[in-house]
Amino acid sequence: MIKFASFLKFRVQINGGRYWSSSPLRSVSNYVKFVFMDNAFKKYSIDTTDYQVGQDNVQKWGFDIHNPVFGISAGLVVFCLISLLLVEPVTARDALNGIKNGIIEQFDAFFMWSTNFFLLFAVGLLFSPLGKIRLGGKEATPDHSTVSWLSMLFAAGMGIGLLFWSVAEPTAYFTDWWGTPLNAEAYSADAKSLAMGATMFHWGVHGWSIYALVALALAFFAFNKGLPLSLRAAFYPIFGDRAWGWLGHVIDILAVLSTLFGLATSLGLGAQQATSGINHVFGLNGGIGTQMVVIAFVTFIAVLSVVRGIDGGVKLLSNVNMIVAFALLIFITFITFDTAMGSLVDTTMAYIQNIIPLSNPHGREDETWMHGWTVFYWAWWVSWSPFVGMFIARVSKGRTVREFLFAVIVIPTLVTLVWMSVFGGIALDQVVNKVGELGANGLTDISLTLFHVYDVLPYSSVISILSIVLILVFFITSSDSGSLVIDSITAGGKIDAPVPQRIFWACIEGSIAAVMLWVGGKEALQALQSGVVATGLPFTFVLLLMCVSLVKGLRTELSAYR
């Protein structure tokens, strides 16, 4: 026994003197605790995990799929579609609208304060020492030029909404279409200022901070820690190897469904809007047939884009998109210079003056407006964050955290400020001065509001055709980038999924939009949209937890930058 005790002392001292004890049993106990705690620490450390990207994948029929995520996602897509199509579209829309509205009404303060927190958290990271950390490692270099990088993140993050809502949203606020911000009197000077300020509030730094934090977490854990480019990887510092199990499966499946149905909804509703524009400009009377042609065209070009990959497809289209968008913006500014410049100054001041009152959910007299617009917007931004965040992450290797946050939050907000000021300012000017359709009847058909504004401008036909082209390109860039994101998630976080897999998801997006439009019309798409917005609630909890995980991860690399 004495020799055995001496042996224990010797072994325990070798593994660390602080575990030595004169009691043999205590020595054994301490040593066992040491071994198991040390192994547990290694198991849950992002620097020592032995998980390999794609280790759970199955290769078959030219696909490289993560078995549970791909199969369950595909099955749930079919189940959701059949369920929506078997039920009367209006009934499905009303039921899902009820769920969405219940979530918005019960969790309004939670959505508002969470979004405020995301903005403050992002600003804190930007100015903290953690901002020096580079995505991909200290010596990493960017994969894309700054211009192409900004073009891709902006095209994926904004899309068609920038065109339609830049005129429709301020007009709606000014004319009391669904309440007015801060209960301002409709058609008053205060209502005009608040209309522009509130529009920018919904499209500015708050929303982009949501995208930025998701993108930053995904990029850091993928490029700095070698983890899969999937949502689950961002939670490894908290959940350890459980992130690779069913907890992670559920997170990724929710991300796939939210992305897929969100894109399909936008594509379907956008096809209706594009068809309305084509009919208005060319004097046609196209209906569901034209909408199917638009969806088929967008899907076909998106397939070509995803086949060519980031550099040959998505980046090229995004650059073309930005060129066309800036050409349109410059031309509109030139022909309405005085109105545009005056609106830019007024909108900037209105945004700065009202950002705090609009961010506060308590004691509001405009609760109906806040629920119908602000809380809906925050839920929508959050529900889209897995898609947009993952795409931004994929193209952001080589940027520092500080550079990344500034570019993703500030630059798009400044571009949006100029865009909204010009287009929204022109629309409100027409309403105030009783010019054109907006001046005579106000907001009647949202899908045609942009073209109603153009009708009273010089070269209206040229501007309208250019806008239709821009609408289609925005559709394509959203579809192809979304397909690449879904490919990555369902491939177990692999960045380059096989070509057949990319084609599969791009076609599925278009097919869902076409089927929903053909069978259920606008009501079916609105039901799908309400379902997507409802996912904003669980994803908000996920994002709050992601902030904790991100800080834990970033702190492991801070010592290399001191």
UniProtKB/Swiss-Prot annotation:
Which GO terms fall under molecular function for this chain's record? transmembrane transporter activity
What upregulates it? Induced by NaCl upshock.
Keywords tagged on the record: Amino-acid transport, Cell inner membrane, Cell membrane, Membrane, Stress response, Transmembrane, Transmembrane helix, Transport
Membrane topology note: Multi-pass membrane protein
Q: Where in the cell is it found?
A: Cell inner membrane
Q: Where are the transmembrane segments?
A: 68-88, 110-130, 147-167, 203-223, 243-263, 287-307, 322-342, 373-393, 404-424, 456-476, 503-523, 531-551
Q: Would you tell me the Gene Ontology cellular component terms?
A: plasma membrane
Q: Which domain of life is it from?
A: Bacteria
Is Transmembrane one of the keywords?
Answer: yes
What GO biological process terms does the UniProt entry carry, in alphabetical order?
Answer: amino acid transport
**What job does this protein perform?**
Involved in the uptake of osmoprotectants. Can transport glycine betaine, proline, choline and ectoine.
PANTHER family, from UniProt?
Answer: HIGH-AFFINITY CHOLINE TRANSPORT PROTEIN, HIGH-AFFINITY CHOLINE TRANSPORT PROTEIN-RELATED
As for family, the record states:
Belongs to the BCCT transporter (TC 2.A.15) family.
Q: Supply the name of the protein.
A: Glycine betaine/proline/choline/ectoine transporter VP1456
Q: What lineage, starting at the top, does this entry show?
A: Bacteria, Pseudomonadati, Pseudomonadota, Gammaproteobacteria, Vibrionales
